[in-house]
Amino acid sequence: MDAYIEFRNVVKKFDDFVALDHVSLQIPKGAFVTLLGPSGCGKTTLMRQLAGFSEPEEGDVLVDGKRMNGLPPFKRNTPLVFQEYALFPHMTVYENISYGLKLKKAPKEEKDRKVAEMLEMFNLQGLDGRFPKQLSGGQQQRVAFARALVMGQEILLLDEPLSNLDAKLRVEVRTELRQIQQKFGITTMYVTHDQDEALSMSDIIAVMRKGRIEQVGTPWEIYFRPANRFVADFVGTVN
C-alpha cells in the first residue's frame, strides 16, 4: 500500500497526559479512513496533527511524501469540518462557500462557477442567498462540506460532522457524502465513536484506545476478525 497520508511514530502530550503514544498509520490516496474509538482515545488529536492545529512532540506527519510538521494550517490544504459547522452567521450561503476563493482573490466568474458546482453537488440549489439561521441542520452541514471542498482540495478531514443531526438525516447525509467522496476520489479522514457509521462508510477503519491504534483493517476485518478483546467488544455493540 502506497501511503498518501502517513503518521510516523507520532507522540502528543498535554502536560503529563500522553494523548498519542507513538501512533503510526498509512492512508492510501482516495481512501475513506475512519478513526473509531471511545471519547478521549486520541481520534481528534491525531486528526489535528494533520490539520496543523496541533504539533507532535515526536514523530512526523507526511502528505504525498512531504513533511507537514511546522506548517501552518492554511499551507497544508487539509480542510477540517467540525461538528459545529463553524459557518459565518453574517454571511449568505454563497459568501460562506466562496470565502476561500475570496481570500485567494479569485475572479467573480470563477467564484460563481465553483459555488454553482458545490450547490448542485450538495443539493443546495436556490439557497445561495440565505443565511445559516434560515437553514436546517442538514443544510448547514452541507454548506460546511461545500465550503471545505470548493477550492478543489484532495484531502478532507471530518470531526464527528453528523453528530448534531437526527438519526434519519444522519444516514441520508452520510450516504451523500460517501457518494461524493467516491466520485471525486477525495482522501478522507473521518472521526467518530459511532460503530455503525464507521462500518457503513469506510474503506479502512483504525480503532483507537488510550492514544494507541489497536487495529487497522477493512470494515469486514474489524468486525469479523478483531485483533483483540477491546476491538471485539467495542465494535460488537452494533445491532
Feature annotation, model-predicted:
Residues A51:
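Helix-to-loop junction immediately C-terminal to a conserved catalytic motif
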Residues R76-P79, Q83-F230:
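ABC ATPase nucleotide-binding domains
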Residues L36-P38:
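The feature captures the beta-strand-to-loop junction immediately N-terminal to the Walker
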Residues G59-R67:
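Conserved ABC transporter NBD signature motif
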